[in-house]
């Protein structure tokens, strides 16, 4: 995929396959690297996402300090396929939008290549 003269490369693979090492090598050579897992972690703390998670799963998923209670969300979702599907329906659009925004910013900043490190790129 190209965006305004910027080549976008997707990097996927299992845990321990060397994605982080390869990402660092690309970054050392001037590529902008986007870590989809990191984007997801950051995005899950946005107020709009938190509000949507409360609507989907109740206030149980929010800590008293208004941050995401990741442990409780995991307990709710990771043993129930329907709830996991619902979690993905809620957060996926926000994550994709944030990744697209970061790609656009990198392209506008003159990046010739963006490496998207996304372990679940094909799901």
Regions from the PLM with identified roles:
Residues 38, 42-113:
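ATP-dependent small-molecule kinase phosphotransfer cores
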Residues 2-38:
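Walker A (P-loop) phosphate-binding motif
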Residues 21, 71-72, 119:
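Active-site phosphate/pyrophosphate-handling residues
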Residues 16, 41, 123:
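Active-site proximal helix/loop that lines the substrate pocket
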Residues 1, 105-106, 123:
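Short secondary-structure boundary/capping segments
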Residues 113-123:
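Switch II (G3) loop of P-loop NTPases
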């Amino acid at each position: 995929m190209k965006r305004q003269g910027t080549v976008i490369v997707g990097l996927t693979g299992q845990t321990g396959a060397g994605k982080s090492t390869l990402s660092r090598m690309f970054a050392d050579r001037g590529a902008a690297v986007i870590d989809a897992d990191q984007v997801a972690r950051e995005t899950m703390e946005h107020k709009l996402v938190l509000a949507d998670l409360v609507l989907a799963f109740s206030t149980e998923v929010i800590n008293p300090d208004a941050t995401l209670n990741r442990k409780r969300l995991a307990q709710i979702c990771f043993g129930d396929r329907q709830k996991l599907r619902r979690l993905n329906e809620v957060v996926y659009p926000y994550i994709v939008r944030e990744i697209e925004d970061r790609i656009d910013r990198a392209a506008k900043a003159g990046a010739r290549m963006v490496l998207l490190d996304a372990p679940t790129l094909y799901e």
